[in-house]
């Protein structure tokens, strides 16, 4: 295991993320995912990964890579773990890997929180200040630091509005949900004609 006194995550640490390579709701890929919108049948989806995925740390990855048989991979495929990278197809020493995943495909409701301060001169032009509020973990850095800043900006605008201040353009303050799951909480597709 590498020391934690460097730039990289420790070997037992796990980087989480979505395996979906697209943006937005996969069931409404080119249009806004709003209530009552048409959605594709999940059986029609072609861009979702077809293989199981389980994030692991690089300490565990090294154990698996050390045990893989097969020919050595091309040099451009090699990573930074100190091991011989093989194509696999078999495992050395008769090892076997069992992967169990407990993922399911389902729809969940997510809600964006959006506030507007109407512009005094150009109300049809927008300045958007936003942050997502969902997180893979507890979110102390991502997204809570950005959410704290967004809330402070909103509070400051509220104080300015009490003193009869108005912005030139409309200000949109947006708190997104479901950003971590392929930017699904974004409302960009619904507002493309305005933006």
Task: Locate each region found by the language model.
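Extended active-site and interfacial segments that coordinate phosphate-rich ligands
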Residues: 1, 129-131, 147
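Mature extracellular/periplasmic domains of secretome proteins
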Residues: 1-19, 120, 188-195
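A general marker of short, structured functional hotspots
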Residues: 3-4, 16, 34, 81, ...
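Acidic/histidine-rich catalytic neighborhood of metal-dependent amide-processing enzymes
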Residues: 135-195
């Amino acid at each position: 295991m590498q020391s934690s006194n460097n730039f990289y995550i420790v070997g037992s640490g796990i980087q989480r993320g979505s395996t979906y390579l697209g943006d937005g709701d996969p069931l409404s890929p080119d249009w806004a995912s709003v209530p009552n919108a048409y959605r594709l049948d999940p059986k029609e989806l072609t861009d979702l990964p077809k293989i199981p995925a389980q994030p692991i740390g690089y300490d565990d990855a090294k154990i698996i890579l050390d045990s893989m048989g097969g020919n050595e991979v091309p040099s451009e495929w090699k990573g930074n773990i100190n091991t011989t990278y093989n194509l696999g197809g078999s495992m050395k020493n008769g090892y076997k890997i069992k992967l169990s995943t407990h993922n399911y495909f389902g729809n969940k409701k997510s809600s964006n929180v959006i506030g507007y301060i109407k512009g005094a001169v150009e109300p049809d032009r927008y300045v958007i200040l936003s942050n997502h509020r969902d997180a893979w973990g507890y979110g102390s850095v991502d997204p809570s630091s950005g959410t704290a800043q967004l809330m402070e900006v909103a509070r400051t605008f509220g104080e300015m509005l009490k003193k009869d201040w108005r912005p030139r353009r409309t200000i949109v303050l947006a708190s997104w949900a479901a950003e971590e799951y392929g930017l699904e909480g974004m409302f960009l597709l619904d507002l493309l004609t305005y933006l």
